[in-house]
Amino acid sequence: GALTALITPMNADGTVDFDGLRKNVKFQLEEGIDGLVPLGTTAETPTLDEKAGSEEDKIIEIVFDEVRKFEKTSGKKIPVILGAGSNNTKDAVAYCERAKNAGADAALVVTPYYNKPTKERIYQHFAACSKVGLPIIVYHIPGRTVLNIQTDLLVRIPELPHLAGEKEERGSV
C-alpha cells in the first residue's frame, strides 16, 4: 500500500504547528492512506528538538494518538514507520529504541551521512540498529547522504536480523 512521509508543519516563528500536524494526520487517515512515516527526512527532523519531552516526542504522541483513534473506529490497522536516522550510530540506535517503545511497526534508518564511513562502518551502523529488535528499513538516498551503497554491501545487509526492506532513492535501480 501507499504510505505518507509526513511533513512537520511549522509556525511563522519556527516552532512546530502541532494543531496543523494533527489535522494533516487525520486528513491522511480519512482519505485512506495505508500507513504513515513520521520523523523521516521530509519531516524537517534536523531542525527539531529531540530531547526527552521534545518536539519530536510530541510529534510521536500526536501521530500515535490519531492512528489509535482511527484504528479503533475503523477497524483498520495503520502501520507507522518511525524515522530513526542519524549519522551517529549511538543516536540512530536510541531512535530505533524510541520507535520500538512508541509502538512503531518499523524504523526507517538512513545511511550515515556527512562522515563518509567505510562499507564496513555502514554495515555496522545498520547491524547496531537491527539489534534493537524492531524491523528496520534501510533508507538509501545518496543524493542527500553523498554515499552510494555499493551492490556488494546491498547484498550483505539483508543478512541482518530484523531487516524489513529498503527505501531506494538512487533514481536508478
Where are these regions (language model features)?
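Catalytic alpha/beta core domains of metabolic enzymes, predominantly
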Residues: K131-V132, G143-V173
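Active-site beta->alpha loop and helix N-cap motifs at the rims of alpha/beta catalytic domains
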Residues: L3-V146
